[in-house]
Structures are given as structure tokens and as C-alpha cells.
Amino acid sequence: MTITGLASSTEYTAYAFANGSICSRITFTTKKGKPTGYTEMTWEDALANWDNLSGKVLINVSGTEGFAQEKESIAAGVTHLIFWGDSQDGQVNMTIKKGIGASGICDKVEFHNLNITDEGNTTLIYQNGASGCIKEIEVTSCTITNIRGIVRMNASTSNAMSVTIDDCIIKGLGRAATSNHYGLLLSDKVTLTTLNLVVSNTSIIVSKGASASQFIHKSGQPGTITIKDCTFYDMSASDAFCRDTKDMTITISNTLFAKGGVKPFYNTSSVATTLNVNGLYKASDFSFVTPDWGKDYTSLPLTSDQLFPNGSSEDLTFGADVPEEYRVGDQRWNK
């Protein structure tokens, strides 16, 4: 069955009926539509004019061959930059060998509809220049494989930052690292007045560096962390989910942890003063290591293998016999 005429970036709930009664339902959000008001160009044109780009730029990439993003710095005149995968067949392939940062004041960088493979043991965003900044980062509807981290901030002129990761699958986080991975956000080298991170409708599958790591590591500044409708699978019990997050307001809802284990906080000094939990779940064989959340969570009466029988192949489709009430976390796997 195909449903047409749906608006972009809109949440819908579809119901299936049998004999006049609801037998199943699924809630989903449609993908973001291509924004307007940008100078749109191909990747080839963008490369040819890279150092002279300015204003609001949308790089439209289509076809099956994909492209290699090897630029380290965004031109100082660019205020907004979007990498947009435009294919009727799904995501457009993109390889990276170097993380990208800004040489000037860049308000926003976005990645949409891309199948990103890291070939350089790097991060998607790597801001390493004190003369520039990226104030807002958005990654949606992407598959990201073998990357060392998503956002790494070593230097920045901005006093605030916002990061949104939505509708993504991140596989093999830190798999190629010879030491630690950089997680979803590493900003411990910069002090920002505020920091906001939202991760939603996303799965992080197999996330293990060669040494102990943190998924969210900041520098003590206030702000918010929101984790919603996510699944974390095959983590390392020596890793910490949050570090230096005492002054953050953390909200976790409908999120599942399976296979392996993790320390919710790096140490007692990292425990968030304000922690809101509304639907935090773990498989029966997953371990939350001390220091724990300090909030109630639900241990499902099923092992990780029972929940995800094909998890070893990085397919987290729920087992056919998993009851509906245990099909929590990222709903893309509730098929």
C-alpha cells in the first residue's frame, strides 16, 4: 500500500484494521523537504568555486555514483551550507576523509538523505579553527558508517551551539579508531554559554573504540540534551554516555539500550542535576554500570538476541514474536 500527498516534516500515524478492530499501527515522520532561498548547485560546481562560495548554498547531489567530500574548511563567506542527497532511490553515497569546519561565521551546516562512509577515521564536523564557528548543525535521514564521531569542536568563536541528529542510522561508531571514539558530540575543548543537543528517531549500532570513550562530552556549560525514540545497540561497558553534564537538563524518552553495557555518567560529578526520564528501556542482558541514571527504567524480560535476532548483521528488526509493548526505541525496526 502506498500513501501519497503527505506533507514534509510531518508526523503521521497509520492504522491497520482487521474485522473492524485495530490490529497494528505505526507512527512515522515524513522526510524534510528541500528548502528554498538557497543558491543551488551540483557538487562539481561547488568544488570548482569552493573558496569563493558565499551566502546560503545548497549542494544538490543525485545519481548512484555519489561523491567524495574531502574539504576541511567552509569558505568564510558561507552563512548556510546544505549537502542534499536528491535521489528517488533513497540516499546518495558520500565518502569523507576529513571532517569539515568553518573559516568564518557559519550559521548552519546540514546533511540530508546521504549514505556517508568514513574513510579517514574522522568526524563529520571538525571545527578546529578559532577564527570560525558553526552555530547550528543538522543531520537527518542519513546512514553513517565507520565514523569516529559526529561533531568535534576543538576551537570556535561562537558562544552557543545547537546539534540535531534525526532519522539516522550510525553504524560502527569508532570501529576504525586506534584509540577512543568521539561519540555524538565532543566539545570539551571549548567553553560555550549554551549547548543544545537533540537526537531523535535514530539508531547507534556497534559503537566501540579501542579505548574508553564518551558519547557526549562537553565542558561544563549549561544547556539541554534530548534523546527521543532512539536505539543504542552493542556498546562498551567501559564507555560513558555523558561526561561533564552536571549543569545540563537531560530528557530521555522511549529509548532502548541492548547488547553490551554503558556507564550512564562518566563519574558522580557528571550526573545531571536535572534528569527527566519517560520511557528508558534496556534488554535483560544489557548493563548500566555505576554511576547509574538515578531514575527508574524498565528492564525488558527479553535478551538482546531475542529482541533483535539479526543484530549481529546490524539489522535491528524486531523478532516476529516480540510483543508490541516491547517494541520500543527507534520505530524504523518495528516492521
Which sequence ranges carry the predicted segments?
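N-terminal "mature head" segments of proteins
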Residues: 37-41, 329-332
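N-terminal extracellular ligand-recognition/capping segment immediately after the signal peptide
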Residues: 41-48, 54-80, 86-99
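Extracellular recognition modules
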Residues: 13-17
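Extracellular beta-rich repeat passengers
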Residues: 73-74, 79-315, 320-323, 330-335
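Extracellular fibronectin type III
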Residues: 8, 19-34
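Short strand-loop junctions, especially beta-strand C-caps/beta-turns
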Residues: 12, 62-64, 154
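Surface-exposed, short loops/turns at beta-strand junctions within beta-sandwich domains
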Residues: 3-10
